[in-house]
Regions:
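Contiguous segments within soluble domain cores/interaction surfaces
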Residues: 1-103
Length: 103
């Protein structure tokens, strides 16, 4: 599980794989957003935030997490969900779990 320091803005790199092989480059998708929810009660912490594609790894999403947002509490765990549209498909990927700590 990734650990982020409270009071920072950091990128989480999320590698995605299409088991059918239809998608080989995330630069071709639209509607690139992610959201973060608190693991314990599923409350929304960081709503519909845009993610970008890693220029060196076209199947890796860069999700920037801002732990300065008031909902992030040191010691708590969070779930990240990624959304996008590729052709007629609109998957929801996740949860990808991470924790926020003071140090």
């Amino acid at each position: 599980m990734e650990v982020l320091k409270k009071g920072t803005t950091e990128a989480l790199l999320i590698y995605m794989r299409d088991r059918l092989g239809n998608l080989t480059d995330l630069n071709t998708v639209t509607g690139n957003t992610f959201e973060v929810r608190k693991k314990i009660d599923n409350s929304l912490i960081q709503p519909a935030t845009a993610w970008t594609v890693d220029p060196d790894w076209p199947m890796t999403a860069i999700c920037v997490i801002d732990t300065n947002i008031s909902g992030y509490v040191a010691g708590d765990e969070y779930k990240l969900y990624i959304r996008y549209t590729a052709g007629s498909e609109s998957p929801l990927r996740g949860p990808i779990e991470f924790r926020v700590e003071d140090d």
